[in-house]
């Protein structure tokens, strides 16, 4: 059985915490009647589940693959509430609508399937044994609920996969003083050698906050500020400036102390100093042109579905991608766990932040309120990560089955909100199609005919290739091929992929390497993203199998990596 043991929130760490992953009581709630049946007040549930794995997964111990509109969890906790202390119950993610009860009393509800949430359970907690009940409701067939690649049919099909209901990410408990740090926005200013901080606080009364930055254990700057409000701004001038880049991903440590009458809240964090700029056809990091050699990573983990079996899986996937010459990934159609982004920060592995927009009705009016709240939660969660170089809230906003087009106003409003919340990174409004307003013009091109690809991109200087002419217009933005390849390579004839599968390994290798060479040779292409790193269920066009075993020998992978790492035209100054 899988185990998740590491602290789930590496960018805001407290020494004292309690991991609640492991065995919980569980039951289905097919009729969504748990509240009416008094389940929050009930003593026990019939089944056992291994949290944080969803009930559809093998690792959960349940393995129920049919639709379930709701499910219920219970756990007994020994607590010792103290005067001047607060008890926070934290969930990294649960699909889709989650209500939490402590000793039969509702302490909060979260709507959304992909972002973390926290409830202060102090006032409902008792000294001694406490009963925690969690009710999760979600249906990927509900078009107001973004559900990503979760299948809306009974079985998986094509590029739609097994569903994920209820809790699927770590659950944990921490105690804090009455006055504590809720979060921070860290904005690097490399030109001024400063870190600008906006901290969010909880609790009443006067608060004094000290921030201190460290590089390799040496103090390199500090700032202090006081407030009676719930947020505070500060700026640290750095005596030593070491930039974060893919080649040298330097990270600073950041110590934060919040002092008040209730005591001290001490938090450890980190940051990277880097700047992203768009310059004509290219992107720059710290003034240097970059060519994005990305791979599509869908965040599926076999026996755990949405959930990695152990915390080391995140770094291992990054290392698999780097082994093949990729310098980053599209984190596709879901919000990845924070520990993945932490490993990306440490490795200098570039990522794009996406959202699980599939399953959501992007054609109807009045849908912004269903989409924007959780999208902005995801942005706030991941804003501080130096490895994250761009946002992409939508992917392939196709016409509805009845022919209705996407709601352009929805995409424009989400783009505008994204740029308002984070003007430091580029935003792609909807990857592939149909662009309304975008910082980077990206397309998806699964052409398998090499001669056709040559014709398409060799003539690029004269005429830009648009994959959806008449529905979107190229206006001179940086140009990116954010999905290509998808070459099927499998012994399973039922496996799904793009185009005709190569008949021999040499044919596969020739196609793979030539695709990479054609795109890298074009001086107007700022990046590519190969589909995909590993197979996912029946979609068998990955470079690795679903269990992450390699499909190819070392010599073949070396040739693939060499083709991907070859210098790109856009990298030349």
Predicted regions and their residues:
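Accessory carbohydrate-binding/adhesion or oligomerization-edge regions at the termini
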Residues: 1-59, 135, 141-144, 216, ...
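Accessory beta-strand-rich segments of carbohydrate-active enzymes
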Residues: 6-11, 16, 25-31, 63-180, ...
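Active-site-adjacent substrate/metal-binding segments within catalytic domains
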Residues: 55-79, 83-91, 95-103, 108-111, ...
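Beta-strand-rich binding/interaction modules
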Residues: 100-102, 193-226, 232-236, 254
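Signal that preferentially marks extracellular ectodomain short beta-strand elements
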Residues: 119-123, 234-249
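Short, aromatic- and glycine-rich surface loops/edge beta-strands on solvent-exposed regions
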Residues: 131-134, 248-260
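Surface beta-strand/loop "capping" patches
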Residues: 175-205, 461, 564-573
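Substrate-binding/catalytic cleft of secreted carbohydrate-active enzymes
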Residues: 198, 316-319, 328-552, 556-559, ...
